UniProtKB/Swiss-Prot annotation:
Impact upon substituting residue 166 to E: No longer activates transcription, does not form probable dimer
Effect on the protein upon substituting residue 112 to A: About 70% transcription activation
Name this polypeptide is given: Transcriptional activator GvpE2
Entry function: Plays a regulatory role in gas vesicle synthesis, required to activate transcription of the c-gvpA operon. Gas vesicles are hollow, gas filled proteinaceous nanostructures found in several microbial planktonic microorganisms. They allow positioning of halobacteria at the optimal depth for growth in the poorly aerated, shallow brine pools of their habitat.
One function term, GO molecular function aspect: DNA binding
Further comment found in the protein's record: Encoded in a 14-gene locus called c-vac which produces cylindrical gas vesicles only in the stationary growth phase.
Amino acid sequence: MDDLLAELKSEMDAAGVDADVEFSLPTLELTAALDATIDDTSQLYTDDPPHHYTDTPLTGDDLPLLEAWLDDAQLHGVGDDIIAEYIDEVLLVLITVRGGACGKELLQDVRRLFGADVSPGTMYPHLKQLADAGLLEMSELTKRKVYRVADAQAAIEHVDSVVLQLLTFAVGLQTIMADCIVNQSADPQPQDE
């Protein structure tokens, strides 16, 4: 893998890409898996509802796409209020990665990925709204409902749009904060005597 990274870096240098880029194996695996998911969305859902559904715990072995992120301290540092604010996007990503999930699995996934305790009273209305909006399909089984992505491209575009807005906001806020720090250090407040 190191040879591939070195080859990629040298190709970037030869192409005149002027950037200090660092690669890590989990980042590349996640990016490659995401690219494969976006290119081949046919496996994300099926047209026929399943006849039998078995709970599958979210593990690194079962879902290599999220392996680098499971039990990650940075993700566990995200506040429950932020998770609740963006629960639609979180649910769409988790259901897309899984290819389908029931509510119990999604609650466990959110807890495992983010350390957040989202209540069923918060999550289930959002699943219904996503289904009503045509982003999810819901199959009713004997003891549970299974949610699948109805239109993978629409789901990806929705999440991508929200993520872009969040990144733009975060970069803008961080830039303003950096300017404030620079201005304060350049113009110290007079001390009271």
